[in-house]
Amino acid sequence: MNTNKIAFAIASVGVALWAAMIAVGAAGLPQMTRQDIPGVRNMTQVDPTIACAGATDASAIPEIAKRGYKAIINLRLASESGAEIDAARAAAAGAGVRFIHMPFEVSNPDESIVDRFIAAVSDAANQPVFIHCASANRAAALLMIKRATADGWDNGRAEAEARAIGLSNPSLRDWALAQIAKRKR
């Protein structure tokens, strides 16, 4: 057998093992589905109690309420373009949905948000909960921390879910992993 055939065989086995590991990891995740609500960007129904999304217009909140969400956790800063915090708060009040504003600055994250986020998401009175920021990066990072600390998931599974939701910022991922390590001590 020549060297090229051996290298190809080894590479083929490696690819097959990698694919199997991905499949096993994905099988451990809840069944997530992409949802479409006009005025909501990048929405994922993570499980029966949690949905994560990116930018959400205040005009979408009545439909969010119609779909049964009890609370909206908004992670956007009031200074972000298109954040509409006051309009979202008013729309939530009008739709009978609890509005929880937890401003989360990616460039200088305040770790105190982690415990407040976990408490709010875990509170049965808020479930099902709709969590959003601008792109789903912050929502996914905070949910990753909750999964790995409060829900007992291993870091790999929590990160795989977060990436599927929308976590793509490497520094935010690193911050989330540091928060997990700090809380798992």
Regions found by a protein language model. Name each.
Residues 129-140:
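A phosphate-binding catalytic loop at a beta-strand-loop-alpha-helix junction
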